[in-house]
Structure formats: structure tokens, C-alpha cells
């Protein structure tokens, strides 16, 4: 298969694509892939690091208010469609996959106009602007949340899940040991992670909660985000707060999927990739949705878990040390609650998500050949 993939800007658009590509190369080793992203997005580092060929285009998003910048955006979009058509003509893909972000809008639109098989993948429960626009032009639509189904043309939609789920499910039997962090393997572990950049409100809340976490019968590993580690260390020093042996504060946690099968529960944002990971692995989760995302989609993502008793939610406006400790204790101090939530999360998981998406890609190709 010759696959052209486009998605950019944030990790939520990129990592599912990389997980899909990894699986596709396992089952179809002769697969050739070209990734098309933006000149300024995270894909500029992540995609080449994964050994995948990358082409970039200059894009920018629409302002939500009337603005002269929007005329520039329209010009850039039309220019990018022209650029995308050239890339498509040169690469000659069998199918084009879009995973979100403005760049995928130009690429998938161009592919559809050239009558190339097209598929979009929507990771969130609330459909993004780009995928909403593309839904009328593409052949197939893969979703990760049932809530997204009604927002698309019904005859094009198939439930796939998030390919990242299959990638992390493969690490379920990880032999990782908490002794690497001077923690114990026979004590329930709560992992707290506000994202790769860290989240100031979450970090401050955890700092305030550490004196109580120090007294708990479970252990805590708290990743501050690389850029915010010094700030957290400063807050701890100013508050004269010293983490006990059962609490570890680290800048980041490398290879998170290898660690997650060994956690009793996770505190995190409610991004689509996180939801895919915790449901694939059956990890009880306390979700703190980011209030800084489009259409409040992280709240909707979190609600899907809460509704199925697979997670708890604290909105950021209600977040403080007491709220965090109350929810953490509810899970960490009751093994039966943990087991029930883990089972509920696993029931929601789609550990074959990449394989499902590969079938959808082939379906798009086959329908064009009829």
C-alpha cells in the first residue's frame, strides 16, 4: 500500500497516525508512507524521528471573529490545496488518511478532488472543524467515540477506536519495575501527569496535596512537565514541603505506555490519546479536562468514561487539593472500586483499533476500484 497521511499541529493528531503506520508496516511490510504536515507543528520533529518521510506546508487556522487574517488563511488554504495536488501527483498514493488539523483539510480536499480514496479519523467525541468540513468530500470516516457518529453522514461512519490503543495494548505485559523510581512494586501506585508541557493548575494542586499524600498507604509518582519542573521545585521549597518516600516528583515519564500497566490509577487531562490508552489497558482514571481546547471537547471525552463508571472527573474550576485527595482516596484505598473501574475501562477499550482502521483504508480503496 502507498499511504499518504496528513495531520498536524498537536500530538493528538500525530500519535494516532504514527501508531497506525507502525501497525500497517507490521502487517504489510512493503507499505510506503509519506506524511504531510505543517511547517510549524510538532510533526516536524516527531515524524522524522519515527523514520517517516515528511513534507510540510504553511498553514494557519481561522480566527473565530471577523478578521483580515481570515482572508490570508483562505489564500493559504487555496495555495496549500494546489501544493497538495502536486505532492499527491508525485507520490501517487493508493489512499489518503487525514487525522485532523488544518493541514489535513487542504490535503484531503485535494485528494478528493483528484478522485483518490480518502479516509478521515476523528479522535474526539466532539468533531473538529477540519473533519466536519471534510466529511462531505471523503469516502470513509473512522471514529473513536460513539458520540461523534451523529455529527457525520451516517453512511460513511465506522467505529475504529484510536490506533494508539493497539500500540499501548501491546505493552500490557511490560516488565517495568517501580524500583527504578525508588518506589515499591507491591504498593498501589497513583500516577499524576498533566501533559508533556505540564499544567500549572494541576501542578499547584498536587504540590498542595503532597503533605497529605505523604501519609497515604499508596504511592504517588507526579510528572510536572519538563518546562515546569523548576517551578514545582520552587513551590515545594517555598512551602517547606518535603515529599515522603512514597511520593516522587519527576520532570517527565519516558515511555509512558510501558509504565501505565503498572499503575493502579492515573490522574490526567482528557485528551483523546489518553482516553485510548487508559481504556486499552483498563486503567481507572481521574480526568481533569483542559478548559483551553475547542468546543470543550475534553469534558465530552471525560464524560464518556464517567458515564460508564470507568473514570472520575474534576473540572478545573473545582480543582483543589481536597477535591483531588477525595477522588484519589476513593479509588486508591478501595481495591474493589479499582477492579470495577478497571473492568469498565477495559470494556470501552478497542485494542484492535489500528487493525480496524487498516480495514477501513482497504474498504476505501476497494470501493474506488468497483
From Swiss-Prot:
UniProt pathway: Cell wall biogenesis; peptidoglycan biosynthesis
Annotated membrane topology: Peripheral membrane protein
Residues engaged in binding UDP-N-acetyl-alpha-D-glucosamine: 10-12, 124, 196, 253, 298
Keyword Lipid metabolism: no
Swiss-Prot/TrEMBL catalytic activity: Mur2Ac(oyl-L-Ala-gamma-D-Glu-L-Lys-D-Ala-D-Ala)-di-trans,octa-cis-undecaprenyl diphosphate + UDP-N-acetyl-alpha-D-glucosamine = beta-D-GlcNAc-(1->4)-Mur2Ac(oyl-L-Ala-gamma-D-Glu-L-Lys-D-Ala-D-Ala)-di-trans,octa-cis-undecaprenyl diphosphate + UDP + H(+)
InterPro entries hit by this protein: GlcNAc_MurG, Glyco_trans_28_C, GlycoTrans_28_N
GO cellular component: plasma membrane
Gene Ontology MF terms in the entry: undecaprenyldiphospho-muramoylpentapeptide beta-N-acetylglucosaminyltransferase activity
Subcellular compartments: Cell membrane
Keywords: Cell cycle, Cell division, Cell membrane, Cell shape, Cell wall biogenesis/degradation, Glycosyltransferase, Membrane, Peptidoglycan synthesis, Transferase
Pfam family, one: Glyco_transf_28
GO biological process, one term: peptidoglycan biosynthetic process
Its job: Cell wall formation. Catalyzes the transfer of a GlcNAc subunit on undecaprenyl-pyrophosphoryl-MurNAc-pentapeptide (lipid intermediate I) to form undecaprenyl-pyrophosphoryl-MurNAc-(pentapeptide)GlcNAc (lipid intermediate II).
Family: Belongs to the glycosyltransferase 28 family. MurG subfamily.
HAMAP family in the record: MurG
Protein name, per record: UDP-N-acetylglucosamine--N-acetylmuramyl-(pentapeptide) pyrophosphoryl-undecaprenol N-acetylglucosamine transferase
Organism: Limosilactobacillus reuteri (strain DSM 20016) (Lactobacillus reuteri)
Annotated gene: murG
Amino acid at each position: 500500500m502507498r499511504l499518504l497521511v496528513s495531520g498536524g499541529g498537536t500530538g493528538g493528531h500525530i500519535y494516532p497516525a504514527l501508531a497506525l503506520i507502525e501497525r500497517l508496516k507490521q502487517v504489510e511490510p512493503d507499505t510506503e508512507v509519506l506524511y504531510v504536515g505543517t511547517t510549524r507543528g510538532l510533526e516536524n520533529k516527531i515524524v522524522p524521528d519515527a523514520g517517516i518521510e515528511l513534507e510540510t506546508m504553511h498553514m494557519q487556522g481561522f480566527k473565530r471573529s471577523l478578521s483580515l487574517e481570515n482572508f490570508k488563511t483562505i489564500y493559504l488554504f487555496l495555495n496549500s490545496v494546489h501544493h497538495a495536488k502536486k505532492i499527491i501527483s508525485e507520490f501517487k498514493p493508493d489512499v489518503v488518511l487525514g487525522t485532523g488539523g488544518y493541514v489535513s483539510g487542504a490535503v484531503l480536499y485535494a485528494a478528493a478532488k483528484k478522485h483518490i480514496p480518502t479516509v478521515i479519523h476523528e479522535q474526539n467525541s466532539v468533531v473538529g472543524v477540519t473533519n466536519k468540513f471534510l466529511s462531505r468530500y471523503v469516502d470513509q470516516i473512522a471514529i473513536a467515540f460513539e458520540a461523534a457518529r451523529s455529527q457525520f453522514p451516517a453512511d460513511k461512519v465506522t467505529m475504529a477506536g484510536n490506533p494508539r490503543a493497539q500500540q499501548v495494548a501491546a505493552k500490557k505485559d511490560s516488565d517495568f519495575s517501580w524500583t527504578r523510581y525508588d518506589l515499591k512494586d507491591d504498593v498501589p501506585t497513583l500516577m499524576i501527569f498533566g501533559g508533556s508541557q505540564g499544567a500549572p493548575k494541576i501542578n499547584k494542586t498536587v504540590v498542595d496535596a503532597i503533605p497529605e499524600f505523604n501519609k497515604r498507604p499508596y504511592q504517588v509518582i507526579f510528572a510536572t512537565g519538563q518546562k515546569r519542573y523548576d517551578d514545582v521545585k520552587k513551590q515545594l521549597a517555598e512551602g517547606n514541603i518535603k515529599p515522603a518516600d512514597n511520593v516522587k516528583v519527576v520532570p517527565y515519564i519516558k515511555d509512558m505506555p510501558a509504565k501505565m500497566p503498572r499503575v493502579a490509577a492515573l490522574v490526567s487531562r482528557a485528551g483523546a490519546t489518553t482516553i485510548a490508552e487508559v481504556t486499552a489497558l483498563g486503567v481507572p482514571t481521574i480526568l481533569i479536562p483542559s478548559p483551553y481546547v475547542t468546543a470543550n471537547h475534553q469534558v465530552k471525552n471525560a464524560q464518556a468514561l464517567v458515564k460508564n463508571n470507568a473514570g472520575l472527573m474534576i473540572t478545573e474550576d473545582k480543582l483543589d487539593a481536597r477535591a483531588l485527595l477525595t477522588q484519589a482516596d476513593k479509588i486508591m484505598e478501595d481495591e474493589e472500586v479499582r477492579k470495577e473501574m478497571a473492568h469498565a475501562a477495559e470494556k470501552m477499550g478497542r485494542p484492535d483499533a489500528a487493525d480496524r482502521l487498516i480495514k477501513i483504508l482497504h474498504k476505501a480503496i476497494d470501493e474506488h476500484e468497483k
